């Protein structure tokens, strides 16, 4: 269904440090584009194969219109986690690298009995979550 998601940032180096740390517990690694011009203005995590023909990625970068990046009210991206521990590690890494807590790790039974999630704001204010489904107690 999706090809990619793109968030704007006003400080690419800071954002790269934040997402390298926050997404590592979820098993996500940086995309390689082999395009030096693109790599100076953006960074991605996930899959970027065959020059983008096979892409499922999360990107951050400087806005294309060269105006300041701003956050959307109500917008959020949630990354899939394979365990509660991955959610916990995502949250801890995000806070240790300039993020702020927007909802600590825990079950959100109002959504579903197996909805374990943590919510953070990245250094630019974008809302990001990690969610684990299919487990109802700590293992």
PLM segments and residue spans:
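A short local loop/turn or secondary-structure capping micro-motif enriched for an aromatic residue
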Residues: 67-68, 98, 136-139
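Core segments of cupin and vicinal oxygen chelate
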Residues: 6-54
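Short amphipathic alpha-helical segments
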Residues: 1-5, 72-77, 116
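Long, continuous compositionally biased terminal/linker segments
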Residues: 38-89
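A short acidic/small-residue loop/turn micro-motif
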Residues: 109-110, 133-137
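Short, contiguous alpha-helical
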Residues: 119-134
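Vicinal oxygen chelate
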Residues: 10-14, 77-118, 123
């Amino acid at each position: 269904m999706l090809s990619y998601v793109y968030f704007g940032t006003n400080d690419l180096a800071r954002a790269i440090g934040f997402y390298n740390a926050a997404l590592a517990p979820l098993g996500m690694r940086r995309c390689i584009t082999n395009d030096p011009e693109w790599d100076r203005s953006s960074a991605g995590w996930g899959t970027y194969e065959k020059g983008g023909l096979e892409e499922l990625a999360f990107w951050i970068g400087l806005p294309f219109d060269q105006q300041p990046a701003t956050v959307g009210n109500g917008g959020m991206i949630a990354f899939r986690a394979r365990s509660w521990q991955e959610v916990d590690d995502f949250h801890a890494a995000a806070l240790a690298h300039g993020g702020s807590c927007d909802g600590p790790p825990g079950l959100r039974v109002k959504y579903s009995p197996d909805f374990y999630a943590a919510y953070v704001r990245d250094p630019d204010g974008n809302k990001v979550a990690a969610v684990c489904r299919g487990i109802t107690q700590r293992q």
